[in-house]
Amino acid sequence: MPHCPGARSASSSLKLERPTAVAISTPQALKRKTYGQAAGLIAPALIVLAIVIGYPIVRAIMLSFQGNRRLDPSTGVFVEGQFAGLENYLYWINNRCMSGTGVVSACPPGVIATDFWPAVRITIFFAVVTVLLETILGMIMALIMNGEYKGRGLVRAAVLVPWAIPTAVTAKLWQFMFAPQGIVNSLLGTHVAWTTDPFYARLAVIIADVWKTAPFMALLILAGLQMIPRDVYEAARVDGATAWQRFTKITLPLVKPALMVAILFRTLDALRMYDLPVIMISSSSNSPTATVSQLVVEDMRQGNFNSASALSTLIFLLIFAVAFILIRFLGADLGGTAEKRAQRRQEKAAKKAQNNQEVAA
């Protein structure tokens, strides 16, 4: 066979290269990578929150198990910070005080602990009434602001003015209006003791709080209303649905997530009410409008930081319990995961039904 000089060079040029390995990322690997990047981004914020929020909570809980400054009957020396167990909690819940001789008995009249349960009832009363009224008014205001008409932007700006005013300014404003010679009594044509009569004092605080915070509820509900497609309402009108049917069958179900979040925020805020009753009515712990937060401040003013920490811990537990109920049982979806959880439940139910069918077959 004749030798071809270019055959070798051609064969060498046609030599196949060795294939390189290509890394293929699985969905699990991509998911882990995404979670890792997200954790790295939010880690600084979590560290700051742990310092600013976590440490004070832990410190308050530690102080709540330590005794206040008092005279030790066995040594005759003032002691403070000794481990007291549940003494500070029983001081508030059962109104149990320790005498100078070390005997624990019922607190005498005038001790701030005797105002605990009345303050709890007033706090819960304020929270329930104000949140209910603010939710109703907020829904009405949100529906008005969500309409299509001229001057809608001006109406939205005007509605939010009360919420933008500082709470202290709001309290002084309504205090002047509810004064004996104020504009409210002038309009009513009678003399009502708004700041001294227990019933009217509580009514005054409720009116001021609803006036200030209803726009906040309206703003959150409006955000939910704007997420509802207009096509849904148009289809309902074509089908002959009345305005009430559109509200109950379309608006309320679709706006429920935003509504429950708004109720959650307002309830937690109402349970910590302090400045309105203090500025408008009185800062005394036996005031007809005294809240639990007022007792904390009053106890701290008397130098009882450990028992005040115990009361703060009780407030924290109350707020945590309310938040858990609203999130777990009433559908307040803060993390936006309710839809995913429902989808997982449906998948589990479908898989279980399929397994049952296979077993039956």
Spans of features found by a protein language model:
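Short, Lys/Arg-rich, polar N-terminal cytosolic tail immediately upstream
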Residues: 2-33
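A structural signal for multi-pass alpha-helical bundles of membrane permease subunits
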Residues: 31-353, 358-361
